[in-house]
A protein has these predicted regions:
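N-terminal acidic leader/helix
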Residues: 3-30
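Acidic, low-complexity, intrinsically disordered interaction modules
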Residues: 27-93, 97
Length: 99
């Protein structure tokens, strides 16, 4: 299932939903780290900006998983950060979710 298709099916988020989303976002974050660390990376600054933007969402999900809950406000903020990342940098819509 595609990343945003999965997110759009969630009415009331659970910690299990957050774990699934976290796994996909974390894979994207790891890919960005690899690209930034490539020798003679011409796009180093771009990859670092990508990582900083995505890190906000990742940190929110970690906090929710640690607290074993997500409030409606946290969910809306998380969705805002994820969609903002997609608009600014792209690449998330091609992620697949493993259930």
């Amino acid at each position: 299932m595609r990343f945003f298709d999965y997110i759009d099916t969630i009415e009331k988020p659970t910690i299990d939903n957050i774990r699934v989303i976290y796994k996909a976002v974390n894979e994207k974050y790891d890919d960005l780290i690899d690209m930034a660390l490539e020798p003679n990376s011409k796009n180093y600054k771009k990859w670092v900006q990508n990582m900083e933007c995505l890190k906000k969402s990742e940190n929110m999900m970690i906090d929710c998983i640690c607290n074993k809950q997500i409030t409606d406000t946290e969910w809306l903020e998380l969705m805002y950060n994820i969609y903002r990342y997609q608009v600014k940098y792209g690449g998330l819509k091609y992620l697949t979710i493993e259930l």
